[in-house]
Amino acid sequence: MELRAVDGERIADKTVLKMMREMGPRCGIRRETDYHRYNSYRGEVGETFENVLGRDFGADGPWRKMGTDVTEFRCSFGKAYLAPAYDFGSREIVAWSISKRPDMEQQREMLDGLAKAMPEGAEPVMQMDMGWQYQHRAFTGRLRGLGVTQSMSRKGNCLDNACTEGLFGHMKDEFFRGRDWDDFEEFKRDLEAYIHHWNHVRRQVRLKGLTPVEFREQALRGAA
């Protein structure tokens, strides 16, 4: 995709696979046990919501369907947590917070970024699990104020938030696997650099060879 978009070279996907077989590069396949999952479920400790999306993650444009979750990274310095706001239509990570603690301050930082990024008139549905953060009145009230509809996965059904879980899988394969950090701030800088790469550089087949930012900008121009 990069050859086509940047250099104008047209090469079939099957040709690329053939060359990879001949030259030796392989794509690593992750195992479920490779990464640690963060579980924020504490029961019904606040306001809960219906599963509005019902695993229908398809979106015909940006700012229609989104997801959020918290994922954990274990490094030599300790643990770090990422809380993103992920657009299912553009595949863009539109806001995020990287923290040593998965607390409400992290969620406030992510929501501040979401508020700055949202275009006027956007009213997306956001999928999430039943974690305690997402039941907290500070979180639910902030989303209402932004015009975002909450959609909650059923207890024990990670497939209800499969789109965001898929993002975490790609991220941990491409950014985290086989690496380690001794310093949180260095880890944070590197993860933010990867998020920039994901949004602005990494082209995706589902976006017809565009980057998430290119897709979003093209879609919004077409809707104007």
Regions found by a protein language model. Name each.
Residues 144-148, 170-224:
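C-terminal domain-tail junction helix/linker
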Residues 1-61, 157, 213-220:
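Basic, flexible linker segments flanking DNA-binding modules
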Residues 29-37, 126-130, 144-163, 179-184:
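RNase H-like polynucleotidyl transferase catalytic core
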Residues 16, 20, 53, 69, ...:
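Mobile genetic element proteins and their domesticated derivatives, centered on retroelements
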Residues 55-94, 100-104:
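An active-site-proximal beta-strand-loop segment
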Residues 74, 78, 96-120, 125, ...:
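Active-site beta-loop-alpha junctions of metal-dependent nucleic acid enzymes
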Residues 90-96, 150-153, 177-178:
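Short small-residue beta-strand/loop micro-motif enriched in glycine and branched aliphatics
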